[in-house]
Structure formats: structure tokens, C-alpha cells
Amino acid sequence: MKVTNDIIYVGVNDHQTDLFEGQYAVPNGLAYNSYVIRDEKVAVVDTVDVKFAHEWLDNVGAALGGTKPDYLIIQHMEPDHSANIYNFMKVYPDTTIVANEKTFVMMANFFREMDLEGRTLEVENGQTLSLGKHDLTFVFAPMVHWPEVMVTYDSTEKVLFSADGFGKFGANDVEEDWDDEARRYYIGIVGKYGTQVQNLLKVAATLDIQVICPLHGPILKENLGHYIEKYDIWSSYAVEKEGVMIAYTSVYGNTKKAAETLAAKLEEKGCPDVYVCDLARADMARAVENAFSYGKLVLATTTYNADIFPFMKIFIEHLTARN
């Protein structure tokens, strides 16, 4: 799939994984995105999950059309994006890997059997790599959401390769609302690092961005202001929904009745949106996502073994871990 005349999408869809990172339900699957930039020099941007090595390498080969890649750019070392580095280098051994210092430290630990002597290009923050007519500038984005992360800006095509930023759950062959699954992805995975995301958004504001190419989810070409605004809201912990979320746990139904009574009273008083959540039955990631969206949060819980009920304790731990 063409992103632009010179940029080809070579990612894959994953309908095998049911829990992303062992905890986030993904009923509509996932996408692991990767890109080929064709120019006088050819660059491949990131790899995909190891389960899809053959499909991805086939996609890369088709995009290359018989040419050889000059560079493999690694923006993020999480295994769903880095696992095929070694497989790629076995197929294309003359490729130079482009990454930053922290990435190469991780790479040496992840792939101890891989000899990269003479096949690396270590870049600094703000450094530019020319492919010919395409100039790629590397912007470090530490803790968005790993310490080595960087993003890549193509000033020729006005494309931002945003690593995990602006990603979402869901495979790219499934139609679904971007906001809901991008919010759940952001709050769950990146939500702890709002300050770092804000720093990256400030840099992005200085760039002329017409296309955003994330490592998960769809390529964003239209209404970019909407997506950037959402990231600004989420990363600044601003109120997205005017209303109240009531999160409760209940053993014999009494706390549930209290929560429902409060919800009814709030609605009578004109509260624009009341969301009641039974934490024992809700998807915890969805509950945490909603807690960050609403301006007001009410917690109602019974005790259990002389302590807070377990599901409420887990919920509070999720909130404090991301604050």
C-alpha cells in the first residue's frame, strides 16, 4: 500500500493475539506497522512481531522490487517492533542499521549472536540523514514510552514516523472508531508519561506534518488537528468528558444500590453524563480509560478481609501508576 509516491506500507495485521502485552483485550486484533522509503538510498522503518516474520519479509521484498535496502531505521526496541531485526539482517546483510545509542545498547542485549560491526550508524537528536531527495530528521522521544524511543520526520513528504505515538489497538483491516481504541491504547500504555508526550508535541508543533505514520493502527492523513488535540488532552490529563464516573465494587449488592442511587440523583440534578462501572465485571483497561476521561470520579467499595475490595484496589493501583 502506498502512503506517498515514495513511501510504501509493509506492515502486518495480527488476529492471533487476544491479550496485548498480556493484559489488554484486543478483539479486533492489532497492526504492526513498518514502512519502506524508496529513494537513491532505500530505508526500511522498523520491523514487526516475530510471529509474522515471513509475511513481513515478503511485504518488504515486494516493496523493494528487487533492490536492496541501504538502511534499517529502528525507532523503538519493544519486541513487537524489533523482533525481526536479526531475521532482516540475515536476508539483507549489507544493510546499515540506523539507531541511537540507547537502542544499540538494547540491541546488543536482545540479539547477542548478531554481529553488527561496520553495519551501524549511531545518530544524535536532531541529526538528519539524506536518502537523496528525502531528508530524515531524528527526534529523540525518551519515555514515549521506552527510554530509547525516537521518531523520524521526512521533511520532503511532510511525514512523521511517530513510533508508538498516535497508535491504537485494532488491526488495519477492521473499521472502528479511532478515538476509543486510541484512547484505551494511550491511557494503558503511554498514559504514565504525559510530560514526555507534551515535550514531543511541542517539537511536533514546529514541523509541517501532513501525514502521521504510527507503529500501530491506521496511517493518519486527514484531520490531523483532531488527533493532535486528543493527544494534547490525554497527555495533559485534561477533562475530556463533562460528567461523573462512578466506579464501584459490591459483594451483596448494597454498594451497587448506593452507586445506582447516586447516579439517579446526579441525573435528576442535570449532570450531563453519568457512567456507572462495576469493576468486578468491567474490562479494567476500559475502566481506567474512562476514569481519565471524566472530570469527576466517585469510588464506592465494600471492604474485604479488612481491606479494600480487590478489584477496587487494582483499579486504584492502575490510576496511581499513571498519574
List PLM regions with ranges.
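Short glycine-rich, flexible loops that bind phosphorylated cofactors or substrates
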Residues: T17, K221, N305-D307
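Active-site neighborhood of phospho(di)ester-bond hydrolases with catalytic His/Asp-centered motifs
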Residues: V45-T47, P69-M77, I97-N100, L160-D164, ...
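Short helix-loop-beta junction
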Residues: E260-V274, S293
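Helix-loop-strand module that forms the ligand-binding subsite of alpha/beta enzymes
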Residues: R281-N323
